[in-house]
């Protein structure tokens, strides 16, 4: 029956007898409460639900948990509960305690599997209240990760499904795992730019003057120098950059890096001519090369390179990267183009301030100093185990590793503008190129001619050396360091023993002074220094380096270097005199004073107006190189590599004596470590095997000696006017550098250079062989060096 039909059947009498109204309900019956009292429970962002509520629990169970905070290294067992609003972690399953971690489901932006641990997944949450992912560069900083590991694979998938179904920002599809991303790295001749390069590498290449032709000739070498530059400049290369390096045949790099620049180098030069000091260096740092004149090329700045090689790259996401930074980064004062290159160094040992002096001498018995040095090296140095090679087992001396000096310490002479449409010829095989020695040099010819062989490391034949991961050794405690330091120093205030004449400079770790000895310190029975070790006279001038130990990142290496220098006495090595521990934080190191200054100063002040004229005569060069070679032979006989031979580290005095200084880069070769593979030194003097990060031995010093010879001939080392990145590339690809004016040189010096600068280490001469070379027969007398020091008067 319809409603209208039912209404027609009702009459007016049906509503006359209404009856009494029902009683109202009691007050307790009305349980309605204002809605505002429950608004906080409806807010998903508010921290409610501190206690577990059985009615809200959707899934729970025991898991292992760690976050990216202070305890990121520790996995903790927690009881995890997932409800409609939160993902919560508790210490127990009782339900009575507060949550240790409570993540609103609205803030979870990503959930994905992770290889950090077995059956592990990562929950990424946004710190933004709205939960929306942050845009721009700051997006990563507003996100935090929580890593959760379950007992079984089944539990892992169950938790992933449950979390995905509850999080409003997730689409229900997890992020991909174990994926690869293939990119192509190459050079586009139409646009004149590199394709597929990481952004930071692309920026470096843009200002490095590495051209598309360089890339086509040897892409692996370009990748190698980019990888070196990137890692030593910024700490760690990006995953894409690492993959690009692997695709181009460059050796893989370990993630742990050691960076430092707060070193102090004591060069015993005449103080009156010393420029102001800057940064952490204790000698004036050579300024960057002056930028070359702009070169006009025909059509394009990049040579046409059609069909340039494209390198297939497979990138894989990196799970964990770690950078270890020692000291603060300091940039040298410079005005040239490479101002983005701070003095950095990576080595398996930590950084220290070089004391700038000699290294240990040969002894028939193991002295107490050597015995202490052996114990120090075993406990304080972090070394890589390389394949053993039988050598005479010497006393173990650990290397001392200050920061890598990527800039030389002198201003490069200005070059005239090069007219014409062609760029400077920096490729091997130029008209004046020295013959690149890949085999034994021919003694009959000895001429330095054009290259006849393909440069080592050509594309398609990468010869990367696989490196073992370094094993970290425990460092000494501060108490142990101070105990060992007290054993090799005078534990007294040296102020009454010296008169400070002049301050040479100020660095991050201390100061260098020119001083005059007033008296010999009294014998101290509590000191490990004997009275007969003091070989200086009253009234002599000395160089004193005051070091602040608290500013040294690796104090044990300072102890190691002092021990090395104490055992060094050679006529061609700057001698260590004594050391004083004034306080627990104030160390004074007294060294021999060389009034003639560095060879760099001599070269700079001997350059004439004629660019083709050598700053020094060949007899003078032969004498200086011979004296330096004698000092190197002394070190090499003790299986010690200097690793930073250059004009800055060779000092002269007014009597014509020549001495090597700055042993901050020295390394000891032992029966277990017959070769090294770390890149240290100054790039312009580096041997090709060092730039390519291959294993090397004492012959890297012979290469540097040859470069220093060219430095005395031409006023500067090869490639000094190039950007450091381009210089590294040219060293790696050209090998033996070319001479500017080979027609002006004698046959003897060209033969000498050919055996020093032989790319194949097997045929490169040793210091013993060099000392018998006919070039040294032309050496002048020491008195003839006096003309080189006239500028100091």
Swiss-Prot record:
SMART domains: PBD (SM00285), PH (SM00233), S_TKc (SM00220). GO terms for molecular function: ATP binding; protein serine kinase activity; protein serine/threonine kinase activity. ATP binds at residues 504-512, 545. Residues 258-276, 312-337, 355-369 have a biased composition (Polar residues). It catalyses: L-seryl-[protein] + ATP = O-phospho-L-seryl-[protein] + ADP + H(+); L-threonyl-[protein] + ATP = O-phospho-L-threonyl-[protein] + ADP + H(+). This is Serine/threonine-protein kinase CLA4. Residues 173-186 form the CRIB domain. GO terms for cellular component: cytoplasm. It comes from Eremothecium gossypii (strain ATCC 10895 / CBS 109.51 / FGSC 9923 / NRRL Y-1056) (Yeast). The lineage of its organism: Eukaryota, Fungi, Dikarya, Ascomycota, Saccharomycotina. Belongs to the protein kinase superfamily. STE Ser/Thr protein kinase family. STE20 subfamily. InterPro entries: CRIB_dom (IPR000095), CRIB_dom_sf (IPR036936), Kinase-like_dom_sf (IPR011009), PAK3-like (IPR051931), PAK_BD (IPR033923), PH-like_dom_sf (IPR011993), PH_domain (IPR001849), Prot_kinase_dom (IPR000719). Residues 8-27, 243-369, 383-476 are annotated as: Disordered.
């Amino acid at each position: 029956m319809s409603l209208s039909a039912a209404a027609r059947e009702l009459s007016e009498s049906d509503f006359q007898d209404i009856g009494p109204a029902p009683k109202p309900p009691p007050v307790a019956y009305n349980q309605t409460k204002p809605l505002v009292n429950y608004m906080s429970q409806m807010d998903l962002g508010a921290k409610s639900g501190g206690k577990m509520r059985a009615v809200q629990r959707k899934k729970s169970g025991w898991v292992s948990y760690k976050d990216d905070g202070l305890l990121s290294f520790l996995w903790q067992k927690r009881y995890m509960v997932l409800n409609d609003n939160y993902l919560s972690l508790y210490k127990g399953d009782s339900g009575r305690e507060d949550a240790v971690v409570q993540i609103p489901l609205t803030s979870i932006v990503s959930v994905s599997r992770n290889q950090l641990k077995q059956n592990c997944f990562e929950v990424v949450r946004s710190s933004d209240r709205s939960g929306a992912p942050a845009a721009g560069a700051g997006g990563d900083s507003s996100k935090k990760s929580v890593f959760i590991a379950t007992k079984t694979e089944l539990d892992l998938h169950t938790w992933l499904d449950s979390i995905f179904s509850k999080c409003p920002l997730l689409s229900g599809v997890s992020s991909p795992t174990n994926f690869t991303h293939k990119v192509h790295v190459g050079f586009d001749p139409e646009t004149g730019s590199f394709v597929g390069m990481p952004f930071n590498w692309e920026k470096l290449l843009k200002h490095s003057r590495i051209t598309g032709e360089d890339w086509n000739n040897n892409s692996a070498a370009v990748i190698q120098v980019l990888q070196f530059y990137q890692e030593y400049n910024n700490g760690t290369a990006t995953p894409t950059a690492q993959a690009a390096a692997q695709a181009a045949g460059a050796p893989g790099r370990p993630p742990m890096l050691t960076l430092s620049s707060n070193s102090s180098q004591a060069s015993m030069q005449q103080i009156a001519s010393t420029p102001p000091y800057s940064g952490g260096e204790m000698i004036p740092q050579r300024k960057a090369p002056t930028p070359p004149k702009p070169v006009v090329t025909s059509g394009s700045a990049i040579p046409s390179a059609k069909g340039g090689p494209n390198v297939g790259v497979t990138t894989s996401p990196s799970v964990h990267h770690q950078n270890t930074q020692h000291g603060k980064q300091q940039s040298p004062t410079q005005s040239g183009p490479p101002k983005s290159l701070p003095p950095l160094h990576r080595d398996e040992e930590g950084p220290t301030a070089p004391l700038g002096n000699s290294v240990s001498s040969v002894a028939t018995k193991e002295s107490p100093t050597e015995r202490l040095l052996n114990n120090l090296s075993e406990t304080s140095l972090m070394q890589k185990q390389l394949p053993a090679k039988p050598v005479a087992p010497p006393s173990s001396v650990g290397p001392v590793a200050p920061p890598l000096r990527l800039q030389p310490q002198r201003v490069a002479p200005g070059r005239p503008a090069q007219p014409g449409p062609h760029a400077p010829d920096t490729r091997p095989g130029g008209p004046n190129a020295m013959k690149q020695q890949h085999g034994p040099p021919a003694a009959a010819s000895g001429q330095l001619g054009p290259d006849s062989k393909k440069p080592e490391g050509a594309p398609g034949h990468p010869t990367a050396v696989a490196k073992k991961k370094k094993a970290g050794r425990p460092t000494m405690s501060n108490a142990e360091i101070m105990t060992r330091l007290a054993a090799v120093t005078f534990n007294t205030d040296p102020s009454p023993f010296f008169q400070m004449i002049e301050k040479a400079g100020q660095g991050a770790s201390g100061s260098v002074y020119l001083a005059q000895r007033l008296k010999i310190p009294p014998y101290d029975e509590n000191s490990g220094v004997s009275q007969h070790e003091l070989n200086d006279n009253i009234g002599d001038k000395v160089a004193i380096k005051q070091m602040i130990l608290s500013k040294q990142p690796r104090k044990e290496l300072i102890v190691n270097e002092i021990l090395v220098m104490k055992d060094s006495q050679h006529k061609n090595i700057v001698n260590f005199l004594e050391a004083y521990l004034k306080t627990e934080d104030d160390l004074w190191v007294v060294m021999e004073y060389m009034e003639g200054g560095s060879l760099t100063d001599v070269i700079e002040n001997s350059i004439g107006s004629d660019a083709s004229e050598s700053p020094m005569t060949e007899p003078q060069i032969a004498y200086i190189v011979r004296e330096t070679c004698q000092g190197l032979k002394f070190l090499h006989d003790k299986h010690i590599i200097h690793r930073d031979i250059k004009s800055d580290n060779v000092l002269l005095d007014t009597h014509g004596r020549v001495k090597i200084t700055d042993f901050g880069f020295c390394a000891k070769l032992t029966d277990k470590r017959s070769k090294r593979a770390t890149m240290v030194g100054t790039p312009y003097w580096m041997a090709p095997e060092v730039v390519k990060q291959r294993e090397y031995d004492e012959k890297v010093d012979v290469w540097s000696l040859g470069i220093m010879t060219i430095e005395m001939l031409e006023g500067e080392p090869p490639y000094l006017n190039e950007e450091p990145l381009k210089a590294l590339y040219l060293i790696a690809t050209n090998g033996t550098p070319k001479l500017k004016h080979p027609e002006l040189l004698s046959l003897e010096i060209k033969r000498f250079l050919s055996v020093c600068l032989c790319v194949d280490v097997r045929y490169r001469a040793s210091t013993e062989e060099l000392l018998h070379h006919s070039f040294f027969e032309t050496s002048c007398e020491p008195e003839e060096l006096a003309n080189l020091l006239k500028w100091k008067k």
